[in-house]
Amino acid sequence: MKPLVLTAFALVLAVHALDASISIPQAQAAQRPLERFTVTADGHPLAVWARRPAAPVGAVLFVHGRTWSARPDFDLQVPGLSRSVMSTFAAQGFAAYGVDLRGYGATPRDKTDWLTPKRSADDIVSVLTWIAEQHPRLPKPTLVGWSRGAAMAGMAAQMAPDRLSNVVLFGFAFDPDLKFVSIDSDKPLKLKNSAAAAESDFISPEITPKAVISAFVEQALKTDPVLVDVKKDDEFNDFVPAKMETPTLLLFGSDDPGMVMDDAGKMFAKLGAKDKQMVVLPGADHAAHLEDTHDAWVAAILNFIKRPASRR
């Protein structure tokens, strides 16, 4: 996946500063079954995948990035390893959901054959609304977006702050003083995805077992054989960090080649939310949630969700 970045530093929490009381129960991680739901957004069916404990304490929606859909990104099955984000969150007591945006995974393209940022953000809001309806006694869902999905998650949080309780922007930051531009083709290209593209995010062999890469390539090409056609990237200019009021976690790996530290610090400083954190995972890259940094990535998000309120 190629991260969406245009291309000061206010707060960084190193992973070793995270709450040590959070442990990731690997043996239980695969116990919850994978469920599939269909959520209708503006008349279009969206595939939503879930792993849910019997009595969840919260709900989380994961939004994939540019190239691959929810299952390879957030429910990766690796023999002998626990790398499914949804399984790990379910084992921690959270109802974990992942959406396939239009054209991705099990969700068909719409009649336009294109996907735009605003269309995606509107669909994310529809799924957030549906999740809240499934869990009326729980807090509103936490929204987690990866790479391009983080930009769309930011748009959704800004559009409908009443539909979520937190937003996590993972593997994405930009200079708020610059503008996004659109470079659109005349017609949808429907290019075939490749094994090389599936391998491209795994750039750190010291934290990336070959089994993870092999599993991702196989599962990603199976779910997403054709690249979705996107346009109107200038709509990302609707995401204005200063207008973001939802509690926000900015999360990325120290070795993510798509992240510019100065841009991350500048964006973090301009976030309108008073309740915000930035966490840098040492040694991690763009696919931190799938590599040996999986547990640290999960712990960063759980710590943010479970952060205590002020009290005397």
Where are each of the predicted segments found?
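N-terminal cap/lid segment of alpha/beta-hydrolase-fold proteins
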Residues: 24, 28-54
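Conserved alpha/beta-hydrolase "acid-adjacent" motif
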Residues: 257-263
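Alpha/beta-hydrolase active-site loop
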Residues: 114-134
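Alpha/beta-hydrolase fold nucleophile elbow
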Residues: 135-147
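Short beta-strand/loop motif that positions the catalytic acidic residue
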Residues: 244, 250-252
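Short, surface-exposed "cap/lid" segments of acyl-processing enzymes
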Residues: 55, 60-94
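Catalytic histidine-centered segment of alpha/beta-hydrolase-like enzymes
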Residues: 284-294
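Glycine-rich "HGGG/HGxG" loop immediately N-terminal to the catalytic nucleophile
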Residues: 71-72, 100-115, 286
